[in-house]
């Protein structure tokens, strides 16, 4: 099923790798999905999208809006979708390559509606506002293990007052030089997003297409629906040259079968339907195979994201994406904890490591708490350390002539140590070295003030927000970008 330039199930990790399926099992999921795409099919609410499907050979029922997508169209779409594309940052040092079987990347979670604020050991939750987005963007700009920025929370202070999603486009771009991934786009406003990015490039739309500093995420409605908004984000994103992330949020036992394999079939059908629409609209559109799929807790009535099932599903999706030769964007580093505590540390490490070992190209979840509803800047700083240590684990144990170190062992001999060895001094940074996770003995820790991890993280947040400098946008360019937001606000208010 893989493309000619990709190998099914291939993972470019040099160290440890997690394999969950045989090739036959991946094929079984694929063929089950093809059955579902024809019976019952997918409900497509957008007339323009239905017409695109119809013109390309799909059976369309205009009474029910159900589209039946044959396998040959899916295969053609998968051949057209690129296995590799670059996400540009405003500073090219932050460019990241999304590639099937390539490096694992991390981004922050989105989109929550609350902030967990920390001060003097106390926690409060408040509605998120536009300034929170700016602050988190600055923090992510600093965080070395956050590769690009995803919309973490919504600007609830603007809701009902202006074009909220357009504000949520400029504010991140202005406050981080890393690539911006919009997780809450509105189909009818994609033109404004394009105009903001084009203004950044001095009005050069072709340059904006070649060097996308902006991308979008949309979610099918489980089970098996593509809403008008989702379709318009796909169609317009494809036409404007924006990378598009088709991300299912199926819930096992709720909006998909209780069996995880059946959930993967539902998930797969939704994502492949969206990817097929993108390729039918503009062949070669850059797409992610996305997942925030998890289980439905039948006893609590919630959709946990700190569960082992979330980690397993995300790892499974990574393998499906590799099977299709596509970059995978999955939930990971996630938690159901309400504050940065022991539960958060355990759940985030578990849900981070599983999909990373499976070779997902991007994990999103950093900074997130409370089943995805709440964001904590202190947790983001802690997650920056968790991610750094995960990266070290992914390296595995390299075995070669240098690392076997026979000459060093013979030189040091019996009963001595390796501390004074030149090789040891040269590789002082070789062991894992977290920034805040504390490895001192109790006495030294107590003498330094006995700060717990959350307190240390809070100090770092304060320091970064005060002192970190983000690469600025030229004042005249920023003025032109702001003019697009002002235009959108006027349209929203009917002026």
From Swiss-Prot:
Reaction equations catalysed: Co(I)-[trimethylamine-specific corrinoid protein] + trimethylamine + H(+) = methyl-Co(III)-[trimethylamine-specific corrinoid protein] + dimethylamine
Single GO term (MF): trimethylamine methyltransferase activity
Presence of keyword Methyltransferase: yes
EC code(s) of this entry: 2.1.1.250
Known role: Catalyzes the transfer of a methyl group from trimethylamine to the corrinoid cofactor of MttC.
Family statement: Belongs to the trimethylamine methyltransferase family.
Official protein name in the record: Trimethylamine methyltransferase MttB1
Natural source organism: Methanosarcina acetivorans (strain ATCC 35395 / DSM 2834 / JCM 12185 / C2A)
Gene: mttB1
